């Protein structure tokens, strides 16, 4: 059994659907202290490393711990979690009709520390303004990197994908299973 050090319901569902036994411990972290001027793969790796360090200071040495974090990058702009609907709209407008990448960093602390950064790139059609408005009103974007839900709102607009869907949802399951 592993311990998912994350409050993400999407990551928990990914593990459950993959048949991986786990327990979940909430792990809150303020990403704003990590510089977004870094390349996205470095940024997300720094976030997950810092999250791991803070968790271990607060909870002591546990084993079989899984830490993960994701960010969305559109062009040279890193998109974290939107603070409000206006910021979510700005992030989604960057994605509409464009190519964006989701970077997910994972650290698994078992017998050894294993680190992985994965990337999935999507090309999206233009988003419908009415559907975008409904999505924003639903609040489903809250707590999601780039306000993106690849399994719901963004899904119907995908015109191409390079990489694993699970990476875009917060865990690269193919790599994680190899870790285990």
Where do the language-model regions lie?
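Cofactor-binding loop segments of dinucleotide-utilizing enzymes, especially the Rossmann-like FAD-
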Residues: 7, 27, 111
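N-terminal beta1-alpha1 ligand-phosphate binding loop
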Residues: 1-20
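A short beta-strand-loop structural module common to alpha/beta enzyme folds
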Residues: 22-33
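Surface-exposed, flexible loop/turn segments at secondary-structure boundaries
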Residues: 10, 30-32, 114
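Anionic-ligand binding patches
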Residues: 2, 38-180
């Amino acid at each position: 059994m592993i311990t998912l050090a994350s409050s993400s319901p999407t990551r928990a569902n990914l593990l459950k659907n993959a048949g991986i036994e786990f327990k979940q411990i909430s792990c809150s972290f303020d990403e704003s202290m990590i510089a977004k001027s870094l390349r996205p793969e470095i940024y997300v790796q720094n976030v997950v490393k810092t999250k791991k360090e803070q968790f271990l200071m607060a909870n002591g040495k546990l084993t079989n711990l899984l830490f993960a974090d994701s960010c969305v990058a559109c062009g040279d702009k890193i998109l974290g979690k939107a603070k409000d609907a206006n910021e979510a709209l700005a992030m989604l407008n960057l994605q509409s009709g464009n190519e964006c990448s989701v970077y997910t960093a994972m650290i698994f602390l078992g017998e050894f520390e294993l680190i992985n950064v994965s990337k999935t790139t999507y090309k999206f059609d233009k988003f419908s303004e009415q559907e975008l408005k409904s999505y924003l009103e639903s609040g489903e974007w809250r707590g999601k990197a780039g306000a993106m839900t690849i399994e719901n709102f963004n899904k119907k607009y995908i015109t191409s994908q390079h990489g694993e869907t699970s990476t875009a949802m917060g865990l690269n399951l193919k790599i994680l299973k190899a870790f285990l």
